[in-house]
C-alpha cells in the first residue's frame, strides 16, 4: 500500500463516525499488502466498521497486551463495544455504570476499586479519570485477591483498563439539569485533551461544576410546632436541604518512556470549591444562620514502571497532597456572631513494588510481590467558638514492608492434572506507625479452577488498622438547630450537633474470610455467574454515634438533656465499639450479546468514496475481488499459514512471537491496519455484522448477620432486627443493583435500578418505625449521530458528537417511614431523606478529531526509521 493511499484513508476517517478514527489511531503501522483478502461474498464493498473496535488477536498460549499479573482470571471482561454501549464518556462515568460489578464486601466500607492501566500501577485515580472511553481497548474486572500482586490489600476489587495503542482527541462537554419538583439546578462543563501513542500519553483537563441551593420551603416539609422559632414560612426558608456548591479544577498527566524500557508518569492537579448552606433561623434577629465552606487542594503524583532483564516487573509511585479547608458558621449570639474552623492537611508517600519469579515447582513458577512504603501526613486544625480559640496538630509517619507469595500446586497440562489448576497464596505486612506502633496483617488463600471457565477463590485475612488522621484530628464543628430523632423519647428534636475528630480512637483488628466463585457456563455465550460470601469480625470497630438508648447508656457524656429530659446537645464524633460481625452473600450475573447492525446502503458508501476521491475499489489494494494483491503475492487464505516473511494475523511471523497488541494485517481503505481479524478492514471493509450490544448485570447483596457489641459488658445492637444503623433505619436484608443497556446503529439506552428491602426500628417508648422498601430507576438515552453514515455524510459537523438525556430516580421514589402508633415523624419525612428526587439532565459532547495533516505528521513520527514515505 502506498503512503498516498494511507493519507487518502486518513481523509476518510474525518468524514466517517468519530469512533472510526480510533481504529486508525490505535492500530499498528501498515502491514504488508499480502494480507489483503477479497470479500468472501465476492462483493466489491463490505460494510463500514464505524466503531473502530479491532479485537486483539491473541496467539494461543500468549498473554494479551496489558494483562494483569498472575493466573486469576477476570470476573468479567468488556471489549471496546461493550464499553461504548454503556453510554459513558469518560472513565468516571464508566465506573459508575459498572458499580454493581466492582463493589466489594471485604473492606470496612466505601473502598474504591484498585485501578490499573495496561496491567500496571498508577499514582492515583486522577491519572485516568478524564480519559475518553473511545480510547479504551478493553476493561477487566478482577477479584480482590489480585490486589495483593500489586502491593495493595485484598479489600477492594481490581479494574484493569487497557488503552488503544494510538488515539488522539480533544473533547468538550456541557451538561445542565434540574429537579422536576423544582428548586434545584445543576450543571457541569469539561474540556479534555488526550493523546496516546508509542512514546506515551498526555491528558489535560479543565472541569467546572455547580448546583443551586434547595431549601425546606421548596419541598413539602412539615414542622413540629414545638420547634418553630419564627413563623413556619421563615423557619422553612432558613434551612437548606442541599447547599449551593461550585467546584473548579485543572489537571494534567504526562507519560513518557524516560530511558530503556522504563516509563515515567507525572500527574498534577489544582482544585477549588466553595459552598453555602443555611442551618436554621436566628431566634433573635429572625434571619437565616449561614454556613460557608472554602476548600483548596493541590496534588502532585508520579510513577516509574519498568522490567528487569530477569523479567521482574517493578513500580515506584509517589504522591504529595496539600488540602486547606475553611468553614464559617453564623451563631445566634450577638456578642460572638460567627464561629470559624480551619484545617490544613499535608501528606506525601513513596511506594515501591516488585513482582517476579523466584523458583520453579512441578506445576510452574512460584512468584512473589515485594512492597516497601514510606509516608507522612500532618494535620493542623484550629477553631474559634464564642470568641475562644483552640488549635491542635497531629502528625503520622509510617513505614510499610509487605510480601505476597503465589505457589502453583497443579496445572491441567502438568502433574496432578486431575486437580485442575490450583494456586496457593500467602501474604504478610508490617506497618510501623509513629502514633500507633507496630501493626500487622497476615493472610492466605487459594485459587482453584477445576474446569475451563470455572473458578473458585477462598481467602483469610487478619488485619490491624489505625484510624485515619482525619478521624483523629478533624476540627470540631458545632451545628445548631440540627433535626434529630431521639429513639429514647420517640420525638424529633432540634439539638446542637457536634462533629469532628476524636483523638482517643484506637486501632481495630479485622478478621475476614471469603469464599468466591465465578462461572461462565457456555463457551459461546457471554454469561457469567458470580458469588461471594464474606464473614467479617472486627474488634474495636470505629463507628459514628447514633441517638439510641443503648448508645446513650454506654456513652452518657456524649448526650446532654435539659431538666424535662429533652435532648439539647449530642456529640456525634466517632468512637470505638467493642466488636462487630457481618455476614454477607453477593450473588450476581453479567450478560452481553452482540447485535446485528444495519448495513449502510451502497449509494452512501459510493458518495463517501467519491467525495474524497477514492479511485480504487474497497476490500483490497484498490483491486477487484479475487485479483492478485500487489507485489505478485498470492491472496491470503483464511486459516492458511503465511508465506515466508509475511506478517501473520495478530502480527506474528511464523517463527516469532506476536507483536504487542497485534491485530489483523493492513487491508482496504483502513490503511493503518486491518479490521477485525485481518483482511478487508478499514472503513469500506471488515466485519460489520455485530456492532451493537445488549447488556444486563444484576447483583443482590444478602445480609445474614449485622451486629455490634457496644462495650464488653454492654448490650448488642442488631441492625437487621430492630436497631437503627443510620438515617434509613436498620440494615436491609436485600440490596439489589441492576444495570441494563442496548446500543446499536448510533443509538443507545441504559437503565439502572437500585432496591433495598424494608427494615424496622424499635424505640424505647414501645413504638416501631417501619422503613418501607424503596427502589429507584435511572434512565440514560444517548445518540451518536456521527455513527450513522447517512447523517455523517450530510452533516460532517456531527462527527464525534453525542446527545444525551438522563433521568435520575425516574419515578421520583422516596423512602417512607411510618410509626406503628401513628405519631408524626418530622425527621423522617420523604423530602428530608431524599430532598432532590427526580432530576432530568441534558448533555452535549463533541469529540474533535485531528486533521489529515496531523495524521500524516503522527504517522511520520511513528514509522520505523528508514521506511519510505511513499
Give residue spans per PLM region.
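N-terminal plug
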Residues: 38, 42-50, 57-108, 122-131, ...
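Outer-membrane beta-barrel translocator/receptor signature
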Residues: 135-137, 152-159, 165-222, 244-250, ...
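C-terminal beta-signal and adjacent terminal beta-strands/loops
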Residues: 611-684, 704, 752-761, 783-870
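Periplasmic plug
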Residues: 104-143, 171-174, 203-205
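Structural signature of Gram-negative outer-membrane beta-barrels, strongest in the C-terminal barrel
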Residues: 385-482, 498-522, 534
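Surface-exposed, low-complexity loop segments enriched in small/polar and acidic residues
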Residues: 115, 211-245, 253-399, 412-413, ...
Amino acid at each position: 500500500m502506498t503512503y498516498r493511499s494511507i493519507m487518502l484513508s486518513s481523509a476518510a476517517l474525518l468524514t466517517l463516525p468519530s469512533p472510526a478514527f480510533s481504529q486508525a489511531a490505535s492500530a499498528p503501522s501498515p502491514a504488508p499488502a499480502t494480507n489483503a483478502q477479497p470479500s468472501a461474498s465476492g462483493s466489491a464493498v463490505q460494510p463500514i466498521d464505524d466503531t473502530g473496535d479491532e479485537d486483539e488477536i491473541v496467539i494461543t498460549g500468549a498473554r494479551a497486551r496489558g494483562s494483569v499479573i498472575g493466573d486469576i482470571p477476570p470476573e468479567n471482561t468488556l471489549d471496546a463495544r461493550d464499553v461504548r454501549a454503556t453510554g459513558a464518556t469518560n472513565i468516571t462515568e464508566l465506573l459508575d455504570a459498572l458499580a454493581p460489578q466492582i463493589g466489594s464486601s471485604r473492606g470496612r466500607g466505601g473502598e474504591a476499586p484498585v485501578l490499573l492501566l495496561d496491567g500496571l500501577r498508577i499514582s492515583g485515580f486522577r491519572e485516568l479519570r478524564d480519559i475518553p472511553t473511545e480510547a479504551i481497548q478493553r476493561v477487566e474486572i478482577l477479584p480482590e485477591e489480585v490486589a495483593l500482586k500489586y502491593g495493595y490489600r485484598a479489600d477492594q476489587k481490581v479494574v484493569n483498563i487497557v488503552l488503544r495503542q494510538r488515539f488522539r482527541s480533544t473533547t468538550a462537554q456541557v451538561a445542565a439539569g434540574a429537579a422536576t419538583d423544582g428548586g434545584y439546578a445543576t450543571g457541569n462543563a469539561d474540556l479534555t485533551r488526550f493523546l496516546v501513542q508509542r512514546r506515551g500519553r498526555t491528558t489535560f483537563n479543565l472541569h467546572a461544576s455547580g448546583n443551586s441551593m434547595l431549601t425546606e420551603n421548596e419541598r413539602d416539609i412539615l414542622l413540629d410546632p414545638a420547634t418553630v422559632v419564627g413563623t413556619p414560612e421563615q423557619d422553612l426558608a432558613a434551612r437548606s436541604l442541599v447547599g449551593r456548591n461550585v467546584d473548579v479544577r485543572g489537571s494534567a498527566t504526562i507519560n513518557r518512556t524516560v530511558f530503556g524500557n522504563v516509563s515515567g508518569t507525572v500527574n498534577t492537579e489544582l482544585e477549588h470549591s466553595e459552598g453555602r448552606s443555611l442551618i436554621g433561623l436566628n431566634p433573635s434577629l429572625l434571619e437565616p444562620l449561614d454556613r460557608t465552606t472554602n476548600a483548596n487542594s493541590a496534588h502532585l503524583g508520579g510513577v516509574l514502571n519498568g522490567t528487569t532483564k530477569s523479567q521482574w516487573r517493578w513500580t515506584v509511585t509517589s504522591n504529595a497532597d496539600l488540602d486547606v479547608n475553611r468553614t464559617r458558621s453564623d451563631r445566634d449570639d450577638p456578642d460572638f456572631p460567627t464561629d470559624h474552623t480551619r484545617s490544613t492537611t499535608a501528606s506525601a508517600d513513596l511506594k515501591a513494588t516488585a513482582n517476579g519469579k523466584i523458583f520453579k515447582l512441578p506445576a510452574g513458577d512460584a512468584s512473589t510481590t515485594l512492597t516497601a512504603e514510606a509516608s507522612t501526613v500532618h494535620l493542623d486544625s484550629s477553631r474559634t467558638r464564642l470568641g475562644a480559640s483552640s488549635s491542635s496538630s497531629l502528625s503520622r509517619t509510617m513505614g510499610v514492608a509487605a510480601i505476597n507469595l503465589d505457589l502453583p500446586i497443579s496445572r491441567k497440562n502438568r502433574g496432578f492434572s486431575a486437580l485442575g489448576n490450583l494456586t496457593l497464596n500467602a501474604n504478610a505486612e508490617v506497618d510501623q506507625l509513629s502514633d500507633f506502633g507496630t501493626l500487622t496483617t497476615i493472610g492466605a488463600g487459594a485459587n482453584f479452577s477445576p474446569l475451563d471457565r470455572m473458578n473458585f477463590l477462598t481467602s483469610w485475612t487478619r488485619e490491624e488498622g489505625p484510624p485515619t488522621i482525619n478521624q483523629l484530628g478533624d476540627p470540631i464543628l458545632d451545628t445548631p438547630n440540627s433535626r434529630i430523632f431521639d429513639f429514647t423519647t420517640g420525638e424529633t428534636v432540634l439539638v446542637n450537633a457536634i462533629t469532628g475528630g476524636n483523638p482517643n480512637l484506637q486501632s481495630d483488628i479485622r478478621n475476614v474470610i471469603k469464599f468466591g466463585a465465578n462461572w461462565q457456563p457456555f463457551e459461546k455465550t457471554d454469561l457469567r455467574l458470580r458469588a461471594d460470601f464474606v464473614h467479617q469480625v472486627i474488634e474495636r470497630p470505629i463507628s459514628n454515634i447514633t441517638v439510641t438508648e443503648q448508645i446513650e447508656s454506654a456513652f452518657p457524656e456524649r448526650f446532654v438533656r435539659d431538666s424535662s429530659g429533652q435532648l439539647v446537645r449530642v456529640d456525634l464524633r466517632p468512637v470505638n465499639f467493642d466488636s462487630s460481625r457481618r455476614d454477607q452473600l453477593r450473588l450476581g450475573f453479567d450478560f452481553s450479546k452482540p447485535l446485528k447492525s444495519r448495513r449502510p446502503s451502497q449509494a452512501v458508501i459510493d458518495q463517501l468514496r467519491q467525495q474524497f476521491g477514492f479511485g480504487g475499489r474497497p476490500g483490497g489494494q484498490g483491486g477487484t475481488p479475487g485479483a492478485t494483491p500487489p507485489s505478485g503475492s498470492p491472496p491470503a487464505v483464511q486459516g492458511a499459514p503465511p508465506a515466508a516473511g509475511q506478517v501473520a494475523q495478530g502480527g506474528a511471523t511464523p517463527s516469532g512471537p506476536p507483536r504487542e497488541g497485534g491485530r489483523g494485517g493492513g487491508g482496504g481503505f483502513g490503511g493503518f491496519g486491518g479490521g477485525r481479524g485481518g483482511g478487508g478492514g478499514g472503513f469500506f471493509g471488515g466485519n460489520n455484522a455485530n456492532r451493537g450490544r445488549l447488556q444486563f448485570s444484576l447483583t443482590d447483596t444478602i445480609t445474614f448477620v449485622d451486629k455490634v457489641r457496644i462495650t464488653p459488658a454492654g448490650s448488642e445492637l442488631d441492625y437487621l432486627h430492630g436497631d437503627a444503623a443510620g438515617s434509613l433505619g436498620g440494615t436491609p436484608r436485600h440490596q439489589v443493583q441492576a444495570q441494563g443497556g442496548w446500543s446499536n446503529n448510533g443509538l443507545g439506552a441504559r437503565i439502572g435500578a437500585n432496591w433495598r428491602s424494608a427494615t424496622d426500628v424499635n424505640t424505647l417508648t414501645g413504638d416501631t418505625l417501619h422503613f418501607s422498601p424503596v427502589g429507584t430507576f435511572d434512565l440514560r438515552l444517548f445518540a451518536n449521530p456521527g455513527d450513522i453514515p447517512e447523517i455523517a455524510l450530510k452533516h460532517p459537523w456531527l462527527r464525534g458528537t453525542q446527545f444525551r438525556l438522563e433521568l435520575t430516580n425516574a419515578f421520583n421514589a422516596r423512602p417512607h417511614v411510618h410509626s406503628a402508633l401513628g405519631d408524626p415523624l418530622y425527621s423522617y419525612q420523604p423530602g428530608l431523606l431524599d430532598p432532590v428526587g427526580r432530576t432530568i439532565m441534558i448533555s452535549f459532547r463533541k469529540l474533535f478529531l485531528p486533521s489529515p495533516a496531523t495524521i500524516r505528521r503522527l504517522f511520520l513520527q511513528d514509522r520505523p526509521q528508514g521506511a519510505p514515505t511513499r
